[in-house]
């Protein structure tokens, strides 16, 4: 699987801390992130047995275009990754996040970081609630980073000492009057590029109880960036059928 490296790390746009479980929120979290997570479906999250989505990235200035499809079972930890290599041949890898220590090196070093990256983009409101280590602050009526208008600014910062892939990251979430994120600015805590990503949060769809922003347009270090999700669906407990996002 050494060929995986070329297309999993070719553009890990941004990566948050490692924790991706729904059991890490024993401590009381700030009301603002709890309410935000509930807006995106937190109260019914336990009904979801599997999630499927394709993370798509287009960076024209860097001539980078990629698509990564994930099927994730949050309760079991199983992840299936699908993409195509440089020759257009299909690649498929299945592993369990609870058994990473025994996984192949390419899975640990390339596939898993790509999964974390894409999953944070996909359901970041949940991570803001689950990640106890993150410091959360809020300010009312802040100017939007893209377009006109104002919104509540909720800043989620990961301390340097936390570890993970990129400690010190900050996510500035601009929350509109309906309680949904309308834009955000990502500040990387480490030296890797891009160091600043600013995009919209739009194209909202629901897959079962899950609310997802499927369209993110803006810039990465000042250059055009388009991140979007397709093929979004969930499989609910007790059912073998996929419920497509609408």
Which residues are covered by each model-predicted region?
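Bacterial N-terminal signal peptides
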Residues: 10-21
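Sec/Tat signal peptide C-region and signal peptidase I cleavage site
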Residues: 22-26
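Gly/Pro-enriched, hydrophobic low-complexity segments
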Residues: 148-244
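Intrinsically disordered terminal and processing segments
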Residues: 28, 39-43, 72, 87-88, ...
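Edge/loop elements at the starts and ends of beta-strands within beta-rich repeat scaffolds
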Residues: 44-48, 147, 210
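Bacterial N-terminal signal peptides that target proteins for export
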Residues: 1-12
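N-terminal mature ectodomain segment of secretory-pathway/periplasmic proteins
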Residues: 31-106, 134-142
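Flexible, processing/modification-adjacent segments and terminal tails
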Residues: 27-34, 95-169, 189-193, 245-246
